[in-house]
């Protein structure tokens, strides 16, 4: 228990019960106050506004306000041909564009019922897992900054630059790649690409452990995240959570394993979930640990893809790409495991047009953010920063 003397309020006793609920005992009652956080705030990771109802330092309710970055993605897709939508998907989760491209390409390929060359599938998985690691490095580095630790950010972005260099070598772009096309790839990878990727895997494996320890062995970071923003597994499932958020609550659910696609059924990897030894299952620290552990699993996947890679002899990355895409009438839904959770595309075709009748994106960030009210209730105002950072939102995908 901590006792504070606050001017105008009197004696205040702050206690935490079961590493979860903050209990405030006051000698004098306080009035409820509405506190607006954002949309211009460094801790909201974009143009997010939170309207918080507070009782002193305790949050009783928090409501997110969205739409500041809305770009009419879904409506715009109805006015362009299927291949032209790929660059639009890059701008959803712009920190994991390869993963977004893969999910959209899978949906249209399912609608067209076309088979993809195996080499294309393996290359797709490699670039997607590289992008997953790069995305988690941003999440881990910026989370440290949110809570006052600047050094891990520098190390994370140092290693992220190597990954962006590899992806730029393959696609020609640092970000927003337009590389995974419907039915194939824009280009085959350079001849020494897999060698360079293998060297990165060898280099980064010990670095991943080092980056994890920089924060988890920091007493201040652990105090700010352990037992904060706990989400029970059943509530997380009811909200429709996915990705590291759901796994952070102890649910072993990963689309690459539970609803496998591409060549993931041929690959051996684990789905990390917290064991409750370092963190309280479902708290901010658990979600951070899941992202840190996932980077090592991505390295395992990349290594296996390189070992199983079919030869490039006679390979044409565009061999399965239709010259004109006009799917038969119907509708499909395809989903993929993105760094922030399940990204799904629902596409409807009228059978006549080269443009989709409807293209709906299912955003994991939007679903995860919708639980802010439950995550923040009973927490202190400074803990709200830790909670937002643990969600790892990208507003480009939330607003679309």
From Swiss-Prot:
It catalyses: a quinone + NADH + 5 H(+)(in) = a quinol + NAD(+) + 4 H(+)(out). NDH-1 is composed of 14 different subunits. Subunits NuoB, C, D, E, F, and G constitute the peripheral sector of the complex. Pfam families: Complex1_49kDa. Its EC number is 7.1.1.-. It is a peripheral membrane protein. PANTHER family: NADH DEHYDROGENASE [UBIQUINONE] IRON-SULFUR PROTEIN 2, MITOCHONDRIAL (PTHR11993:SF10), NADH-UBIQUINONE OXIDOREDUCTASE 49 KDA SUBUNIT (PTHR11993). GO terms for cellular component: plasma membrane. NDH-1 shuttles electrons from NADH, via FMN and iron-sulfur (Fe-S) centers, to quinones in the respiratory chain. The immediate electron acceptor for the enzyme in this species is believed to be a menaquinone. Couples the redox reaction to proton translocation (for every two electrons transferred, four hydrogen ions are translocated across the cytoplasmic membrane), and thus conserves the redox energy in a proton gradient. Gene3D superfamilies: Cytochrome-c3 Hydrogenase, chain B. Keywords: Cell inner membrane, Cell membrane, Membrane, NAD, Quinone, Translocase, Transport. InterPro entries: NADH_Q_OxRdtase_suD, NDH1_su_D/H, NiFe-Hase_large. It is found in: Cell inner membrane. GO terms for molecular function: NAD binding; NADH:ubiquinone reductase (non-electrogenic) activity; quinone binding. The keyword Chaperone does not apply. The keyword ATP-binding does not apply. SUPFAM superfamilies: HydB/Nqo4-like. Its main location: membrane. This is NADH-quinone oxidoreductase subunit D. Belongs to the complex I 49 kDa subunit family.
């Amino acid at each position: 228990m901590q006792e504070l003397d606050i001017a105008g309020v009197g004696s205040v006793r702050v206690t935490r019960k079961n590493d979860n609920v903050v209990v405030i005992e006051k000698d004098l009652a306080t009035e409820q106050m509405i506190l607006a956080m954002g949309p211009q705030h460094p801790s909201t990771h974009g143009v997010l506004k939170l309207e918080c109802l507070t009782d002193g330092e305790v949050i009783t309710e928090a409501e997110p306000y969205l739409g500041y970055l809305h770009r009419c993605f879904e409506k715009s897709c109805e006015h362009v041909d299927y291949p032209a939508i790929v660059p639009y998907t890059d701008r959803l989760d712009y920190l994991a564009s390869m993963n977004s491209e893969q999910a959209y390409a899978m949906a249209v390929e399912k609608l067209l019922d076309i088979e993809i060359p195996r080499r294309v599938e393996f290359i797709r998985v490699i670039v997607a897992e590289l992008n997953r690691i790069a995305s988690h490095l941003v999440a881990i580095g910026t989370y440290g900054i949110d809570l006052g630790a600047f050094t891990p950010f520098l190390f994370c972005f140092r290693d992220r630059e190597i990954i962006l260099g590899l992806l730029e070598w393959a696609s020609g772009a640092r970000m927003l790649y337009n590389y995974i096309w419907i039915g194939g790839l824009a280009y085959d990878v350079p001849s020494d690409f897999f060698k360079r990727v293998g060297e990165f895997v060898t280099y980064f494996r010990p670095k991943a452990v080092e980056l994890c320890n920089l924060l988890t062995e920091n007493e201040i970071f652990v105090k700010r995240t352990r037992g904060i923003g706990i989400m029970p597994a059943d509530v997380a499932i009811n909200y429709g959570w996915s990705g590291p958020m759901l796994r952070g609550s102890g649910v072993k659910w990963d689309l690459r394993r539970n609803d496998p696609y591409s060549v993931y059924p041929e690959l051996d990897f684990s789905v990390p979930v917290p064991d409750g030894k370092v963190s309280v299952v479902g708290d901010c620290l658990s979600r951070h640990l899941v992202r840190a552990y996932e980077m090592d699993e991505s390295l395992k996947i990349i290594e296996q893809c390189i070992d199983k890679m079919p030869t490039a002899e006679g390979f044409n990355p565009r061999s399965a790409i239709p010259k004109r895409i006009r799917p038969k009438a119907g509708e499909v839904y395809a989903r993929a495991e993105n760094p922030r959770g399940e990204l799904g595309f629902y596409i409807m075709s009228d059978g006549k047009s080269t443009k989709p009748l409807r293209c709906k994106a299912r955003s994991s960030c939007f679903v995860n953010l919708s639980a802010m009210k439950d995550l923040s209730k009973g927490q202190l105002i400074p803990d709200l920063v830790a909670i937002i950072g643990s969600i790892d939102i990208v507003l480009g995908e939330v607003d679309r």
